[in-house]
Amino acid sequence: MNDNAFTFQTLHPETIMDALFEQGIRVDSGLTPLNSYENRVYQFQDEDRRRFVVKFYRPERWSVDQIREEHQFALELVKDEVPVAAPLAFNGQTLLAHQGYHYAIFPSVGGRQFEADNIDQMEAVGRYLGRLHQTGRKRPFTFRPDIGLAEYLFEPRQVFEDAALIPSGQKAAFLKATDTLLSAVTECWRTDFATLRLHGDCHAGNILWRDGPLFVDLDDARNGPAIQDLWMLLNGNKAEQRMQLETIIEAYEEVSEFDTAEIGLIEPLRAMRLVYYLAWLIRRWGDPAFPKNFPWLTGEDYWQRQTTTFIEQTKILHEPPLQLTPMY
């Protein structure tokens, strides 16, 4: 997936509207960009006042087979009555192409922001995650990757080594902190967990609330442990996180089994996300949208803070993992 140098500068509004017109959709409103840096996503209304979202995928990030697997997973979830935003089919195809771009069209789904501190909402999310994972366990992804150390740690480490935008005065300390963190994660990482198809990026921003949860954006769907779709929902101090996790697991287990031994993967997964996110920003720096929206990435203070964050996360990895109350 060598997509580092790509930009969306050739994706003009006329190109988008032509692509939609090819599918029989006439745009009757403007194209409203939605918050997405990795892809380009727009909301619009057609002549019949129906609202849609069109998503143009970043070329070469995912293969055609990988995107189709994501779409198939979404459609399976809908069939199993799991509330997800799934792509629409045109002439039997959900993945469409126009002028070198692949794209998909979704119904526009409104909703309020999921309230991460609302225990009732957290319980409902836990129940539906159990159902989502029931579907995910039916078979693994064939083309999409597994969550693992190579993609999330070792490849990003090389990105840091090669990155010219990390200030020279901070690079040595940052790389040292990175290496220490990588060693700590490697020591406590496990591969004996049950693998299933995951949402992959299940945080509060990817859940809408409409008399219940609605999961959106399966772009990061992968194979991995169930805990990956739970830990990003936790917030606050350890006591608050314990209560939230117990709420999620209790609701989850109404419909699906959960291996509580996976709780020990929360902090390694958090460390992997920290490392991967920084490498992602560096890889995308050639896209003009990134320097514009992340101007602080070249600053000394920013990298000093990241070094401190990595050191603190290493300390957390050496502490006992989050513990549930004895009933679990």
From Swiss-Prot:
Which cellular components does GO assign to this protein?
Answer: cytoplasm
- Is Kinase among this UniProt entry's keywords? yes
- Name the Pfam families on file: APH
Cytoplasm in keyword set = yes
Documented EC number(s): 2.7.11.1
State the reactions this protein catalyses.
L-seryl-[protein] + ATP = O-phospho-L-seryl-[protein] + ADP + H(+); L-threonyl-[protein] + ATP = O-phospho-L-threonyl-[protein] + ADP + H(+)
Q: Which residues form the active site?
A: D201 (proton acceptor), D217
What EC class is this? transferase
The positions annotated for binding Mg(2+) are N206, D217
Q: Which residues cross the membrane?
A: none
Q: Which UniProt keywords apply?
A: ATP-binding, Cytoplasm, Kinase, Magnesium, Metal-binding, Nucleotide-binding, Phosphoprotein, Serine/threonine-protein kinase, Stress response, Transferase
Q: Where is this site: ATP?
A: S36
Q: Which locations, inside or outside the cell, does it occupy?
A: Cytoplasm
Names of the cofactor(s): Mg(2+)
| GO MF | ATP binding; magnesium ion binding; protein serine kinase activity; protein serine/threonine kinase activity
Instruction: Explain the purpose of this protein.
Output: A protein kinase that phosphorylates Ser and Thr residues. Probably acts to suppress the effects of stress linked to accumulation of reactive oxygen species. Probably involved in the extracytoplasmic stress response.
Q: Which family does it belong to?
A: Belongs to the SrkA/RdoA protein kinase family.
**Known partners and oligomeric status:** Monomer.
Q: What PANTHER family does the database record attribute to this sequence?
A: STRESS RESPONSE KINASE A
The identity of this protein, by name, is Stress response kinase A
Gene source species? Salmonella paratyphi A (strain ATCC 9150 / SARB42)
